[in-house]
Design a protein with these regions (language model features):
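Acidic/His-rich structured neighborhood in mature extracellular/periplasmic domains
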Residues: 117-172, 231
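Active-site acidic/histidine clusters and adjacent loop/turn architecture
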Residues: 48-113, 174-184, 189-192
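Envelope-exposed proteins and targeting segments
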Residues: 106-108, 132-136, 191, 225-229
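N-terminal low-complexity, Pro/Thr/Ser-rich intrinsically disordered segments
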Residues: 32-59, 290-292
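Catalytic cores and adjacent binding grooves of peptidoglycan-active enzymes
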Residues: 33-36, 153-353
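Bacterial N-terminal signal peptides that target proteins for export
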Residues: 2-15
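C-terminal segment of classical bacterial N-terminal signal peptides
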Residues: 19-28
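Extended, low-complexity, intrinsically disordered C-terminal regulatory tails
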Residues: 35-48, 94-125, 196-218
């Protein structure tokens, strides 16, 4: 039997198991239902079976996730205690390939932040997205020339690329042409759908990038993201349960849509009605609000340590698509000034879904 046929067979078995679990009283494992972040945020291991994404980037889950190794050629995983270095095989293969390609342009190595929880889903703290194993945060801070201890990976501070004494301004003491080359390299991979950065960083790229601007439109401005950039992969081919995001519009994004971020509107506090009653607390997202398969995935048998190791090796062997830009430009040494305090961020954020 060929590899493709075997893969189809495994996928069919997973689909049958999911359907059978769902057939048992609807949500047998969660008959009383529960807040999804409490369920998925407390699962330590991925589910057994084939890898797949279910739902959308901000409302879904994943099965058969693969763990990014704690370190590899050109990268180290950070904040290990969060247990958020789990992704789809395509994401793990992308990170490993991108890390090697980044070193070719002179970047010392990648520090990898959150990817997803073992079975995806909403998190107890932090992200609205990162739910289906196809999102990853990559620090702007370059990797040191040593393997960090677990404690160092917890305590090493972020480096903001902004000048906190000014409004939405990149700090040229910390930002360098190599930072620009790094994020533009990331955008050049065909499987990368979007990259989220701070509006000031997007503006800096628009003003200073002299190379090929074909992939500039993939780089999207968003609140925060001054200490890391957020890479989002497209739904993999042949993934019917992964809900794709609307395509990025034409153009490089260096237009009125970027200028809006530098107006008062996105930063203004919402107007309060003094006569209005206090708003009710928002209803938590429940397991039943996610795609139906997610209840089965949350209650499915955990992958064994041996199976997880095999999946990790298979993901590492998976060929990642080549970047589509020239990576042979001269190297540039990154700046490494330490940052001031975090940038204040509005409480209201647009959806990343």
């Amino acid at each position: 039997m060929g590899k493709q046929a075997k893969g189809v067979g495994k996928a069919s078995l997973l689909a049958l198991s999911v359907m059978s679990i769902l057939a048992m009283d609807g949500y047998s494992a969660f008959a009383q239902d529960a807040p999804a972040k409490q369920v998925f945020g407390n699962i330590a291991l991925p589910s057994a079976g084939p890898s797949a994404s279910y739902g959308s980037y901000a409302k879904g889950c994943q099965s058969g996730a693969v763990a990014l190794p704690t370190e590899g050629q050109g990268f180290q995983a950070m904040r290990l205690s969060r247990n958020r270095r789990w992704g789809q095989p395509q994401m793990i293969a992308f990170i490993e390939r991108f890390a090697q390609d980044a070193q070719k342009i002179g970047w010392p190595g990648l520090l990898i932040g959150d990817i997803s929880q073992p079975r995806g889903g909403p998190m107890l703290t932090g992200h609205a997205s990162h739910q289906i194993g196809l999102d990853a945060d990559i620090w702007w801070r370059p990797m040191p020339d040593r393997v960090m201890s677990a404690d160092q990976r917890e305590s090493t501070p972020f480096i903001s690329m902004l000048d906190k004494s000014k409004f939405l301004t990149v700090d040229d003491r910390k930002w360098s042409p190599l930072n620009a080359k790094l994020v533009m390299l990331a955008a050049s991979y065909p499987q990368v759908e979007r990259i989220f950065v701070n509006p000031a960083i997007k503006q800096k790229l628009c003003q200073t990038w002299k190379g090929d601007r074909t992939y500039m439109g993939k780089i999207r401005p968003i609140y925060g993201h001054d200490e890391h950039f957020h890479v989002r992969l497209e739904c993999p081919p042949g993934a019917p349960n992964c809900k794709p995001q609307a395509a990025v519009g034409a153009g490089d994004g260096c237009d009125k849509s970027l200028a809006w971020w530098f107006s008062k509107e996105p930063w203004a506090a919402p107007k309060k009605d003094p006569n209005a009653k206090p708003p009710k607390p928002p209803r938590p997202v429940m397991v039943s609000d996610l795609p139906r398969a997610c209840a089965a995935i949350a209650s499915a048998q955990s992958a064994s340590a041996g199976a997880t190791l095999i999946r990790n090796r298979e993901a590492s062997a998976m060929p990642a698509a080549q970047p589509e830009m020239d990576t042979n430009a001269p190297s540039v040494t990154p700046n490494a000034l330490m940052p001031p305090a975090d940038i204040p961020r509005p409480s209201s954020r647009p959806s990343l879904n």
